[in-house]
Amino acid sequence: MIDRVLLELNKTEGIKGSMVVGKDGLVIASQLPGSVDAELVGAMASAAFGAAERTAAEIGMGTLEQTMIEGEHGKTLMVDAGEGILVVLTDAKVNLGLIRITMKRAADKIKAMF
């Protein structure tokens, strides 16, 4: 069922792939391009999201809603999805507003599955 949510999410313009990873770094579901090592990306995304959560708490920002890694060739966005983290890989030039709204809806569906 999570795979269906990811497949639908991947239809959004600019999204190259998506996955749900546990807070422990283990892949729960993945719809990433074949050239991407899902287990490696999942472990790194979980670590990055965890560090961002701790940073947000330490500086008094409250609960972390989203974190983004932006590079020359694309972006990686991560949002809390209950027992997991929704990770989305995008092109460099994307409509971030659309991506964020679409991710929020997908994360809500995923939360309901846990």
From Swiss-Prot:
It comes from the Archaea. GO terms for biological process: cellular response to amino acid stimulus; positive regulation of TOR signaling. GO terms for molecular function: guanyl-nucleotide exchange factor activity; molecular adaptor activity. SMART domains: Robl_LC7. InterPro entries: LAMTOR2-like, Roadblock/LAMTOR2_dom. Gene3D superfamilies: Dynein light chain 2a, cytoplasmic. PANTHER family: LATE ENDOSOMAL/LYSOSOMAL MP1 INTERACTING PROTEIN. This is Uncharacterized protein MJ0310. It comes from Methanocaldococcus jannaschii (strain ATCC 43067 / DSM 2661 / JAL-1 / JCM 10045 / NBRC 100440).
